[in-house]
Amino acid sequence: MNRIDERFAKVKADGRKALITFLTVGDPNMEVSEKAIYTMQEEGVDLIELGVPFSDPAADGPVIQRADERALAQGVDIFKVFELVRKIRNNVEVPMVFLLYYNVMVQYGIEKFFKRCQETGVDGLIIPDLPYEESDEIKEYTEKYGVYQISLVSVSYTHLTLPTTM
């Protein structure tokens, strides 16, 4: 059972809604990102989305785009994000998921990326530019390494396509 399953079972048992937070790692810097994650845990969040900075975050709005630019200007990349998760994982029980673009995974190497997620304690991935219908190519790795893919549903989905994709 993944930390996400455990947390959502607790949320359900408590009869409450989950509080999910987001931050772009490295904005304004790595130290503040680390402190923010600890603060989120102390304040009782249920899941933390860690935005992995990307040079062309087409699926994100202007606020996240500017945050990515600031983090990238400081040299934050997937290697530094993995290192942060590795550093804090033993002290952070809250599930952590990456919000990242598929190209980051491809450049890293797909299986190597999933293995690193497992090693560092990343619980799941939100990949906005990988449509669910095309996600079969990573399914074997999500299962092998126990890292969840959390799919997004676009406003262009209809009542006809949604049941076939979920």
Pin down the residues of each PLM region.
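Glycine-rich, proline-tolerant flexible connector loops at the mouths of alpha/beta enzymes
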Residues: 49-76
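Conserved, mostly hydrophobic/aromatic
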Residues: 21, 51, 117
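Active-site-adjacent beta->alpha loops and helix N-cap segments on the catalytic face
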Residues: 2, 59-61, 76-83, 108, ...
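Catalytic beta/alpha-barrel core
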Residues: 123-134, 148-157
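Active-site beta->alpha loop and helix N-cap motifs at the rims of alpha/beta catalytic domains
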Residues: 68-126
